[in-house]
Amino acid sequence: MGETYVSPEAVSDNHHHGESETAIFVRSGNPEFVFHDGHGEVRIATAPGDYVFVPPYVPHREENPDPSNPAVIVIARSTQEAIVVNLPALYALPDKPGGGSA
């Protein structure tokens, strides 16, 4: 678990965290988390006290659209190592056989 400061107007690379489940708690600021739902990008705007869960292998990126203030988030992962796999673009995970999304 660790605390991360996201600089004003920062945008991360598109990435996923491999087999790691990622839990994010927003301490301050209004970071946004961007995913792809198979039709286009989906943006989740957050506020202090919000919680975001990112399942394993789900491509996403983080953004702090605030031009002046950093965002502070606490990140907990289900693996000991911090896995980050950078991607050229966001994409939706294919449906699993038998129904349901990954």
What is each of the regions a protein language model found here?
Residues 48-51, 91-92:
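A short, sequence-level motif marking secondary-structure junctions
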Residues 1-14, 20, 80:
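A short glycine-rich, His/Asp/Glu-containing loop-to-beta-strand
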